[in-house]
Amino acid sequence: MADQPKPISPLKNLLAGGFGGVCLVFVGHPLDTVKVRLQTQPPSLPGQPPMYSGTFDCFRKTLFREGIRGLYRGMAAPIIGVTPMFAVCFFGFGLGKKLQQKHPEDVLSYPQLFAAGMLSGIFTTGIMTPGERIKCLLQIQASSGETKYTGTLDCAKKLYQEFGIRGIYKGTVVTLMRDVPASGMYFMTYEWVKNIFTPEGKRVSELSVPRVLVAGGIAGIFNWAVAIPPDVLKSRFQTAPPGKYPNGFRDVLRELIPDEGVTSLYKGFNAVMIRAFPANAACFLGFEVAMKFLNWATPNL
């Protein structure tokens, strides 16, 4: 690889990753709302059209019926959850890299970067699961016509009152199935594209803003190419009525495949891919900007 990195600071990764997560949510939440509504819409009755025919139809109907606020519905949950989640995510990646280095100047291979990314996926599941559970419930309730929860805190409170801590953490296993391999792909792809973009004799840290944006966007696409099938299972499982899937995601899979085919595992694909590039481009740019600021302001942190 072209760059000889500075000693890795997991703490700086933690702080810069939190800022990157905020950037991701602001850019990507509208299409995340569309994705969840497409993934959780019920099968259409014979002879009747589906509630949403696709990504743009869902976007248009949501905007028309609920305004711009409808597209940002449930955003408080990911802002509250995503900021620490991405902080922990980038911390886990930094720690994973540091654990594999014998010396600060060691340059990691791509399989080692993938392994470091997988560690970050394990770290983030504890934060990601309740945030995703609340977000999905808030996103689908408007399209169902039922208003059970008035907001993020109300949803968390009612889930805890009805089902305890297990109700808030419903979907932990399938979230792990999604995030561990997807996070490995995410960070490995970002480092790979950055190295491709780095001219001979230059350092990766000197990449221009457009190249950082493209590298982050491509990393987001590769991440979601791995994550979409378990994400569909997660969305269905987390928004299902209590007791509908007693055996977890396996019951969701048994219902989806016979009824809707293998393609049902890629519901919301267009919305995910349209969102993946700009949202993750913003995330990595935010991370890099914050990291440069921290390196300047606190070089010894």
Curated annotation (Swiss-Prot):
Protein name: Mitochondrial carnitine/acylcarnitine carrier protein
Compartment(s) where it occurs, according to its Swiss-Prot or TrEMBL record: Mitochondrion inner membrane
Family: Belongs to the mitochondrial carrier (TC 2.A.29) family.
Gene that encodes it: SLC25A20
Swiss-Prot/TrEMBL GO biological process terms: carnitine transmembrane transport; lipid transport; mitochondrial transport
Entry keyword annotation includes Iron: no
Membrane topology (Mitochondrial matrix): 32-73, 132-170, 231-267
Residues that bear N6-acetyllysine: 148, 157, 170
Species, as recorded: Macaca fascicularis (Crab-eating macaque)
Function: Mediates the electroneutral exchange of acylcarnitines (O-acyl-(R)-carnitine or L-acylcarnitine) of different acyl chain lengths (ranging from O-acetyl-(R)-carnitine to long-chain O-acyl-(R)-carnitines) with free carnitine ((R)-carnitine or L-carnitine) across the mitochondrial inner membrane, via a ping-pong mechanism. Key player in the mitochondrial oxidation pathway, it translocates the fatty acids in the form of acylcarnitines into the mitochondrial matrix, where the carnitine palmitoyltransferase 2 (CPT-2) activates them to undergo fatty acid beta-oxidation.
Record keyword Transmembrane helix present: yes
Any one Gene Ontology cellular component term annotated for this protein: mitochondrial inner membrane
